[in-house]
Curated annotation (Swiss-Prot):
Keywords: Endonuclease, Exonuclease, Hydrolase, Metal-binding, Nuclease, tRNA processing, Zinc
Binding-site positions, Zn(2+) 2: D68, H69, D212, H270
Function summary: Zinc phosphodiesterase, which has both exoribonuclease and endoribonuclease activities.
Gene name per UniProt: rbn
Pfam families on file: Lactamase_B_2
InterPro entries the record matches: Metallo-B-lactamas, RibonucZ/Hydroxyglut_hydro, Rnase_BN, RNase_Z/BN
Gene3D superfamilies: Ribonuclease Z/Hydroxyacylglutathione hydrolase-like (3.60.15.10)
Organism: Escherichia coli O81 (strain ED1a)
Cofactor binding summary note: Binds 2 Zn(2+) ions.
Protein's name in the database: Ribonuclease BN
Residues the record marks as active site: D68
Length: 305
């Protein structure tokens, strides 16, 4: 998997940062796998500066209904339709997302020529497609808001083909059954258990993408042990009280959570427009003083998971 940040500014865009939107490229060889987390104004313009086509999008996750996370959605939906894209799209978001989308399309005389499903969510598991599952956790914010935990299922270990051939198992369809952990019977009556010829499973990756939030009860469970945690760092340590009063977090709080949760990497985003490049480096230094494995997201930055 890889993350592509399309927008990293909080509240309003700046000359170098658009408002919030994050692409998750699942990099699955046989299935569509491009997900979008939040869709601030101008997201479709940001997409034009990447190698990704909106037609590859099959899921959009909205954290909450504040405009800097949402106002780019109607335009993206319409442009996707005007481009002749017919691939189905599912939108997940809090209560009100259906009314917002349907109203925007209706009063603008717009529609989609592709199947569009809108799912209003609550806390808990959203779906499990057999390859990965997504779970929503409630955030601490003035509006109903969610963070998302994406967990890949463990992958089967490699099949020891050499040992199977030595045991007299012919390559072909039987190998596929054994790869699935099944037991087969050979023509000579011997039973071969696939589990005996599989290496240990390959652990799946886990990712936590937080919505806007101050310190909250669900944060540790959402982030626990993930490979990558994406968290806002709207303001610096000195302005922590102001950040919390508006349902946001400081650099210290994001980094302390990453340390407590035992994450592999922290990526901070949703930076207040008050910070220029020098100020953003100050935010990064504050985080790294607590959790060294911290990166600062810039627009179009790409991170492998």
């Amino acid at each position: 998997m890889e993350l592509i940040f399309l927008g990293t500014s909080a509240g309003v865009p700046t000359r170098t940062r658009n408002v919030t939107a994050i692409l998750l490229n699942l990099q699955h060889p046989t299935q569509s796998g491009l997900w979008l987390f939040d869709c601030g104004e101008g997201t479709q313009h940001q997409l034009l500066h990447t190698a990704f086509n909106p037609g590859k999008l099959d899921k959009i996750f909205i954290s909450h209904l504040h405009g800097d996370h949402l106002f780019g959605l109607p335009g993206l939906l319409c442009s996707r339709s005007m481009s002749g894209i017919i691939q189905p799209l599912t939108i997940y978001g809090p209560h009100g997302i259906r009314e917002f989308v349907e109203t925007a399309l209706r009063i603008s005389g717009s529609w989609t020529d592709y199947p569009l499903e809108i799912v209003e969510i609550g806390a808990g598991e959203i779906f499990d497609d057999g390859l990965r599952k997504v779970t929503a956790y409630p955030m601490e914010h003035p509006l109903e808001c969610y963070g998302y935990r994406i967990e890949e299922h463990d992958k089967p270990g490699a099949l020891n083909a050499q040992a199977l051939k030595a045991a007299g198992v012919p390559p072909g369809p039987l190998f596929q059954e054994l790869k699935a952990g099944k037991t087969i019977m050979l023509d000579d009556g011997r039973q071969i258990n696939g589990a005996d010829y599989l290496a240990a499973p390959v652990p799946g990756k886990a990712l936590a993408i937080f919505g806007d939030t101050g310190p909250c009860d669900a944060a540790l469970e959402l982030a626990k042990g993930v490979d990558v945690m994406v968290h806002e760092a709207t303001l610096d340590m000195a302005m922590e009280a102001k950040a919390n009063s508006r349902g946001h977090s400081s650099t210290r709080q994001a980094a302390a959570l990453a340390r407590e949760a035992g994450v592999g990497k922290l990526i901070i985003t949703h930076v207040s427009s008050r910070y220029d490049d020098k100020g953003c480096q100050h935010l990064l230094r504050e985080c790294r003083s607590i959790f060294p494995a911290t990166e600062l997201a810039n627009d179009f930055a790409v991170f492998s998971i």
